[in-house]
Every structure is written in C-alpha cells, then in structure tokens.
Amino acid sequence: MDSVVFYMKVNVGSGNPVKVRATENVLGLIYGNVEVRGVEVESGVPDQPVGLEETVRGAVNRARRAFRDCELSVGIESGLHRVPETITGFVDLQWCAIYDGEHITLGVSAGFEYPPMVVEEVLAGREVGDVMDELTGVDELGRKRGAVSFLSGGLLDRTGNTEQCVLMAMIPRMNPSLYGLK
C-alpha cells in the first residue's frame, strides 16, 4: 500500500536562492515536509529600502503578492534603518513577513553596520548589492554568501542571517494560543 506524504506548500516572494533556502531550512525544522518555491513579485518599495516603514512594507507586499496555491507565503526585505550611536547612523536589518491568507506575522534578523563608504553610496542612490559587489569583487554577493559573510569574516552568512528573521516571524505561529491565532 502506498503511503500518503503530506507537505506544506510555501511561496517565497523572491527568486533569490538565499531567501528560498533560508525559508526552507527554518520551515523544514518546524513542519517537516515543506515544498518551498520562489515566486518573482514586486515589492512595491524602492530597490534599496531605507527606514522601518519602507522595509516592512516591502516584506509584507512580497508575502501578500506571493500568496497563491500555497498554505503560507513569505516576504523578506532588507533595508537600512537609522540607529543612533552607530558609526554611519544606519544598520541593515532583514524583515520577514509570513502570510496565511488572513494574518501577517513579522520577524527581524540581527542587524549589522555597513562601512561608511557603502552607506554613503546607498544614500546617494545606489543599491547595497552593487556597492558590495564592487567592494568585494564578487558578482551578485547578495544571492550567494552575502555582505554579512564578507564583513563577519565568514562567521555568519546571509542564509543564517535570513533564517533569523524567518524564525522570528514564525514565533506567533508556533504559539498560536498565546497570540490569538487559529
């Protein structure tokens, strides 16, 4: 007799393999069998979000727009946030929004600071990824190990940093009665 294998379908509102892999890693630990696929969607915010509102809105838009033929959809957006007492005045944070067709839950990664020349270029209108590609000599660094890996000497890569925000966004879903979720 054939056994039936149940799995959860999850869409990630991005074609970035790091975001898909991080989502699959975290949700696989929580749910077991998951099928995670990247779905290209528009974030509805500038390519380089600056500030809490833009970054969170980008993550939420990605999650909502990726919700089709799935149980959960995930939106992940990185952005620069003003933080006092930092060298540059900004910290990079990744926000994750998870949508089930009714509720959005949010989580954020550990933040880190880019070098001053990177922040200056971004504030002048360039994307972090382009500046970091030039700085490191690695093409599409953000789709690979990420700037955080370069800056931390390999102690944390972008997949690990992205896993943090996905896990934090899952906390209410892992404790639904504490958060008033079904």
Swiss-Prot record:
Its EC number is 3.6.1.73. This is Probable inosine/xanthosine triphosphatase. Homodimer. Keywords: Hydrolase, Magnesium, Manganese, Metal-binding, Nucleotide metabolism, Nucleotide-binding. Belongs to the YjjX NTPase family. Binds 1 divalent metal cation per subunit; can use either Mg(2+) or Mn(2+). PANTHER family: NON-CANONICAL PURINE NTP PHOSPHATASE_PRRC1 DOMAIN-CONTAINING PROTEIN, PTHR34699. InterPro entries: ITPase-like_fam, Non_canon_purine_NTPase, NTPase/PRRC1, YjjX_NTPase. GO terms for molecular function: ITPase activity; metal ion binding; nucleotide binding; ribonucleoside triphosphate phosphatase activity. GO terms for biological process: nucleotide metabolic process; thiamine metabolic process. The keyword Amino-acid biosynthesis does not apply. Phosphatase that hydrolyzes non-canonical purine nucleotides such as XTP and ITP to their respective diphosphate derivatives. Probably excludes non-canonical purines from DNA/RNA precursor pool, thus preventing their incorporation into DNA/RNA and avoiding chromosomal lesions. Its cofactor is Mg(2+); Mn(2+).
